[in-house]
Amino acid sequence: VVLGPASDGRNAAANVKAPDLIALTVRNDCCHNAPCRNNHPGICG
């Protein structure tokens, strides 16, 4: 089986624009933090 270049995860971040990566990081950190998640329900789905 041959997988695409980003399928191993090493290059996945390189394919994301920096602001998107920052937003994703903030969202992940916030959504794992109950007070932040409760204060920002729109970003955690």
From Swiss-Prot:
Family classification: Belongs to the conotoxin A superfamily.
Main function: Alpha-conotoxins act on postsynaptic membranes, they bind to the nicotinic acetylcholine receptors (nAChR) and thus inhibit them. Has possibly a distinct nAChR binding mode from other alpha-conotoxins, due to a different three residue motif (lacks the Ser-Xaa-Pro motif).
InterPro entries: Conotoxin_a-typ
Keywords in alphabetical order: Acetylcholine receptor inhibiting toxin, Amidation, Disulfide bond, Ion channel impairing toxin, Neurotoxin, Postsynaptic neurotoxin, Secreted, Toxin
Propeptide: 1-27
Any GO molecular function: ion channel regulator activity
Cellular location(s): Secreted
Chain segments carrying region Lacks the Ser-Xaa-Pro motif that is crucial for potent interaction with nAChR: 32-34
Modified residues (Cysteine amide): 44
Gene source species: Conus leopardus (Leopard cone)
Tissues expressed in: Expressed by the venom duct.
Domain notes: The cysteine framework is I (CC-C-C). Alpha4/7 pattern.
Identification of the protein by name: Alpha-conotoxin-like Lp1.10
Gene Ontology cellular-component annotations: extracellular region; host cell postsynaptic membrane
Disulfide partners: 30-36, 31-44
